[in-house]
C-alpha cells in the first residue's frame, strides 16, 4: 500500500508540474494578436515568440538530462518551478513602459520559460521511466494528457484574464505556477534523489550514431514541427483570414487540445499492450491527410462559419492522430537507450529526446509565419506541413521491424526482472 501511495502522489506531482508548464506555454496564444498590434510585429516575429520557448530545450536538453541524473528529478523540477514563476512576472514587465523595446523582454521571458520547461519535461519523463518501468507507455501518455490539459487551460485562462486586466493575467499565471511548488517539495525524494549515472553519462553522440535513436529523433522533430507551426499559425489564420472573434478561436483551440489529450491517454495504454509501431503508422497517415485537408479548406472555402466548422473537425483529427505518432516514441527512446547503453542515464536520454522535440517546435513556427508572409496564402502555409508528415510515415514504414524489435525485446527483459 505504501508503494501504491508513493506512486499515486508521484504521479499527481508530475502531472501538476506538466500542467503549469504547458499552461504557461499556451497562455500567450490568445494574447499573440494583441502583442502583434501593440509591438507592431510581423507574422514572422509573432510566431517566433512561440519558437523562443523551445530554444533552451534544443540547446540545453542533454544538459538538463545530466542535471536530472546528478541531482534527481524532484530537485530539478522544484528549481524549474521557481524559474517558471519568474518568467510569468517578466511578461508583466514587458507590457510596461520601458526604455527598451518590450519585444525583447517578451523574448527573454519565453527563453527563461523554455529553459525551466525543458528541465521539467526531461526530469518528469526520467522519473516516470524509473517509477513505472513496465508501464511507461501508459504513464507517459497520461503525463502528456495532463500537459495537454495545461495547454487547454492556458489559452482560456490567458484570454479571459487578459481581457479583464492585462496585468492581472500574468500575476495569475505566476500564482498558479507557484502553487505547485509545495506539492513537488513534499514528493522530491519520491521522484528521484539523483546520483551519478551508472555509465558515467550516455554520450550525446549515441543519439546520432545509434540507428534506432536517430530515427526516433527525426520522427519526434517532425511531429513537433507540425504542432508548433499550428499552435503559432492557427490563431492568426482564424483571426485574419476568417475574421473569427476570440470566442471562436478559443473553441477551435479547445477542440485541438482536448483531442490531443484524449489521444495521449488512449495511445499510451495501447502501446503498453500491443507495441508502438502500428499506432505510429496510423498516426502518421491521419496527420498527413488532415493537413492536406486543412490546406484545401483554406483554399476553397471562403465562408468563415463553414470554414471554421471544417477546421474544427480537421484539426481535432490532426491532434488526436499526432498523439498516436508521438506518444509511442517516449517508451521507445527509453527502451532503446537502456538496450544499447544500459541503465543509469534516463535523464540524459530524455534530455536528448527533448532536443529533438524542441528542434521541431522551433522550426514549425518559423516555417508557417515566413511562408505566409512570402505567399500571402494560408492554404500553402497549412498544406505544406503535410510534407514532413508524409516523410515521417515513410521513415516509420521503412524501419518498422527495427523499431518494433527494439521495443519488444527490452520490455520482455523488464517484465522478467
Model region roles, listed by residue range:
Residues 143-188:
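Helix-loop-helix hairpin linking two adjacent transmembrane segments in secondary transporters
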Residues 1-5, 189-217, 414-417:
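Juxtamembrane intracellular "pre-TM" segments in multi-pass secondary transporters
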Residues 30-44, 232-247, 335-338:
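Short amphipathic helix-loop junctions that connect adjacent transmembrane helices
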Amino acid at each position: 500500500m505504501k508503494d501504491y501511495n508513493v506512486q499515486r502522489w508521484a504521479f499527481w506531482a508530475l502531472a501538476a508540474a506538466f500542467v503549469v508548464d504547458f499552461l504557461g506555454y499556451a497562455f500567450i496564444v490568445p494574447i499573440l494578436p494583441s502583442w502583434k498590434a501593440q509591438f507592431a510585429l510581423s507574422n514572422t516575429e509573432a510566431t517566433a515568440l512561440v519558437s523562443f520557448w523551445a530554444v533552451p530545450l534544443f540547446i540545453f536538453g542533454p544538459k538538463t538530462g545530466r542535471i536530472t541524473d546528478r541531482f534527481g528529478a524532484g530537485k530539478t523540477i522544484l528549481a524549474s518551478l521557481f524559474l517558471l514563476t519568474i518568467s510569468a512576472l517578466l511578461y508583466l514587465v514587458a507590457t510596461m513602459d520601458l526604455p527598451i523595446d518590450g519585444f525583447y523582454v517578451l523574448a527573454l521571458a519565453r527563453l527563461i520559460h523554455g529553459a525551466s520547461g525543458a528541465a521539467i519535461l526531461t526530469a518528469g519523463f526520467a522519473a516516470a521511466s524509473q517509477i513505472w518501468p513496465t508501464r511507461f507507455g501508459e504513464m507517459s501518455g497520461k503525463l502528456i494528457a495532463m500537459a495537454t490539459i495545461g495547454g487547454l487551460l492556458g489559452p482560456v485562462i490567458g484570454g479571459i484574464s487578459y481581457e479583464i486586466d492585462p496585468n492581472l493575467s500574468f500575476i495569475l499565471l505566476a500564482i498558479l505556477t507557484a502553487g505547485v511548488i509545495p506539492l513537488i517539495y513534499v514528493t522530491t525524494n519520491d521522484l528521484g534523489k539523483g546520483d551519478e549515472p551508472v555509465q558515467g553519462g550516455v554520450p550525446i553522440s549515441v543519439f546520432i550514431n545509434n540507428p534506432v535513436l536517430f530515427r526516433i529523433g527525426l520522427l519526434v522533430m517532425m511531429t513537433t514541427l507540425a504542432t508548433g507551426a499550428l499552435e503559432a499559425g492557427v490563431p492568426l489564420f482564424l483571426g485574419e483570414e476568417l475574421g473569427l472573434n476570440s470566442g471562436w478561436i478559443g473553441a477551435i483551440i479547445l477542440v485541438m487540445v482536448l483531442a490531443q489529450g484524449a489521444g495521449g491517454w488512449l495511445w499510451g495504454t495501447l502501446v503498453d499492450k500491443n507495441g508502438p509501431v502500428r499506432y505510429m503508422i496510423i498516426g502518421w497517415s491521419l496527420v498527413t491527410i488532415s493537413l492536406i485537408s486543412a490546406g484545401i479548406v483554406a483554399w476553397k472555402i471562403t465562408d468563415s462559419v463553414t470554414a471554421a466548422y471544417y477546421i474544427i473537425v480537421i484539426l481535432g483529427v490532426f491532434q488526436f492522430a499526432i498523439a498516436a505518432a508521438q506518444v509511442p516514441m517516449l517508451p521507445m527512446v527509453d527502451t532503446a537507450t537502456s538496450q544499447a547503453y544500459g541503465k543509469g542515464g534516463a535523464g540524459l536520454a530524455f534530455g536528448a529526446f527533448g532536443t529533438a522535440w524542441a528542434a521541431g517546435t522551433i522550426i514549425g513556427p518559423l516555417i508557417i509565419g515566413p511562408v505566409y508572409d512570402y505567399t500571402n496564402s494560408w492554404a500553402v502555409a497549412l498544406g505544406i506541413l503535410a510534407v514532413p508528415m508524409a516523410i515521417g510515415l515513410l521513415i516509420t514504414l521503412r524501419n518498422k521491424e527495427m523499431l518494433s524489435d527494439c521495443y519488444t525485446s527490452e520490455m520482455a527483459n523488464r517484465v522478467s526482472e
